[in-house]
């Protein structure tokens, strides 16, 4: 019987053919925790009486939400993870010395691999599906169960085939494609399903575009997002010291899908998600007509904090100045991205334009620190959520966009079409 890529990944892990709707127990290749969620997992682990990790090399802790610590509480949270990592000689522990946002850092380190089953106590764990893996977010107690047993229970998800056709125009990115998908199907349109991205557009999308798309699959309610392994994936992994051998799968031509969604990417404008849902998408053309003035532009997060994002921002900002009424904050996804951006001159361009470049952190995205919005302030942001109060005050507003839109809007002072 024909299978989707997701069904094949689970089948290989279980040792028999499994299909959508089945409840299975499955070993996990990589379990991911961060400074916010891991302390809860550690408590559950210790309360269970467990004294060892089932798969130490398959467990990563990345301190990224409030690192360097923003206050005493976050410092104490981080210490719990540090002490645990030291106690168990955890190889894959990342703090200030080798820091980054978890969903940017782990692919960089070769710790997530095609064909993997990956879970993380963070909803945007679905990012890693861009490498041809099944990757999903779970709760902290689910994480603890995997720490103890090496596996977990899953219902094999049904799949929605997203058939993307055409070559994207300049400044239309993976971020715009996923915002358009969410606009079409809504924030619960893919509930407990896999969004499988296919079609002629895929060959034109960089690995960074694919990370952005899979990252925001959860914003449509999806269990995961996935892009099959191809030459772009191969090129990205070529210089990585991979934790495991890739296991490459492709959906059968006659695999069963609950829905097929066709999108003409060639005619797609950059998309702006208006407050207060990622599904509230509008063309950047309409947004410019609406003359939406901004107080802050933010470029970063696990969605759009990669080198290509800093590159396009620098290209637009070169020789320009940020509008006097606007703050521009740029947060690279990892130290390596920061280092490369500095080497290529992007950091100087951003700073010369009046922007501020921070250390890698999730901070501003979740309204934690390093870019919180005040009462009634408006931001254009490359992050993934724009709920009420997401980046600060409950009276603030966040418009989601790609990095080119954020950069040109920072210069103009209102949401602007970069084309």
Swiss-Prot record:
Q: Which SUPFAM superfamilies match?
A: Aconitase iron-sulfur domain (SSF53732)
- Pathway membership of this protein? Amino-acid biosynthesis; L-leucine biosynthesis; L-leucine from 3-methyl-2-oxobutanoate: step 2/4
Gene Ontology MF, one = 4 iron, 4 sulfur cluster binding
What Gene3D superfamilies has UniProt attached to this entry?
Answer: Aconitase, domain 3
Copy out the cofactor comment.
Binds 1 [4Fe-4S] cluster per subunit.
The UniProt entry's GO biological process terms, in alphabetical order, are:
L-leucine biosynthetic process
Q: Which CDD domains match?
A: IPMI (cd01583)
Q: Does the keyword DNA-binding apply?
A: no
Binding positions for [4Fe-4S] cluster? 302, 362, 365
EC number in record: 4.2.1.33
Q: Which reaction does it catalyse?
A: (2R,3S)-3-isopropylmalate = (2S)-2-isopropylmalate
Cite the InterPro entries for this sequence. Acnase/IPM_dHydase_lsu_aba_1/3, Acoase/IPM_deHydtase_lsu_aba, Aconitase_4Fe-4S_BS, Aconitase_4Fe-4S_dom, HAcnase/IPMdehydase_lsu_prok, Homoacnase/IPMdehydase_lsu, IPM_dehydratase_rel_enz, IPMI_cat
HAMAP family assigned: LeuC_type2
Report the function annotation for this chain: Catalyzes the isomerization between 2-isopropylmalate and 3-isopropylmalate, via the formation of 2-isopropylmaleate.
Q: How does it assemble?
A: Heterodimer of LeuC and LeuD.
Query: Which NCBIfam families does the protein's record reference?
Result: hacA_fam, IPMI_arch, PRK00402.1
Q: What is this protein called?
A: 3-isopropylmalate dehydratase large subunit
| Organism field | Sulfurimonas denitrificans (strain ATCC 33889 / DSM 1251)
Name the gene for this chain: leuC
């Amino acid at each position: 019987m024909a299978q989707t890529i997701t069904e094949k990944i689970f089948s290989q892990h279980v040792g028999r053919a499994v299909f959508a709707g089945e409840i299975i127990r499955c070993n996990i290749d990589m379990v991911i925790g961060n400074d916010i969620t891991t302390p809860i997992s550690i408590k559950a682990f210790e309360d269970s009486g467990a004294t060892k990790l089932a798969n130490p090399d398959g467990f990563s802790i990345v301190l990224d939400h409030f690192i360097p610590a923003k206050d005493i509480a976050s410092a104490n949270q981080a210490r719990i993870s540090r002490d645990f990592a030291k106690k168990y000689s955890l190889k894959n522990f990342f703090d200030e010395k080798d820091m980054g946002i978890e969903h940017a850092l782990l692919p960089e380190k070769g710790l997530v691999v095609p064909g993997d089953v990956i879970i993380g106590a963070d909803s945007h764990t679905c990012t890693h599906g861009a490498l041809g893996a099944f990757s999903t977010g779970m709760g902290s107690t689910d994480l603890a169960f995997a720490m103890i047993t090496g596996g977990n229970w899953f219902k094999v998800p049904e799949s929605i085939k997203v058939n993307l056709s055409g070559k994207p125009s300049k400044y239309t990115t993976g971020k715009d494609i996923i915002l358009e998908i969410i606009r079409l199907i809504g924030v619960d349109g893919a509930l407990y399903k896999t969004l499988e991205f296919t079609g002629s557009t895929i060959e034109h999308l960089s690995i960074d575009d694919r990370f952005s798309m899979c990252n925001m699959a959860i914003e449509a309610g999806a269990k995961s997002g996935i892009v099959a392994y191809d030459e772009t994936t191969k090129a990205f992994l070529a210089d990585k010291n991979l934790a495991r051998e890739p296991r490459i799968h492709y959906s059968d031509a006659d695999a069963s899908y609950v829905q097929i969604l066709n999108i003409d990417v060639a005619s797609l404008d950059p998309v702006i998600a208006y407050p207060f849902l990622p599904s509230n998408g509008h063309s950047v053309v309409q947004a410019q007509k609406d003359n939406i003035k901004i107080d802050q532009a933010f470029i970063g997060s696990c969605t759009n904090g990669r080198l290509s994002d800093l590159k396009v921002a620098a290209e637009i900002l070169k020789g320009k100045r940020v509008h006097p009424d606007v703050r521009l904050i740029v947060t690279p996804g990892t130290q390596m991205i920061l280092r490369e951006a500095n080497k290529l001159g992007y950091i100087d361009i951003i700073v010369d334009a009046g922007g501020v470049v921070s250390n890698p952190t999730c901070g501003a995205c979740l309204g934690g620190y390093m870019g919180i919005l005040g009462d009634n302030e408006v931001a254009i942001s490359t992050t993934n959520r724009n709920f009420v109060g997401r980046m600060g005050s409950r009276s603030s507003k966040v418009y989601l966009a790609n990095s080119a839109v954020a950069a040109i809007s920072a210069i103009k002072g209102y949401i602007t079409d970069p084309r």
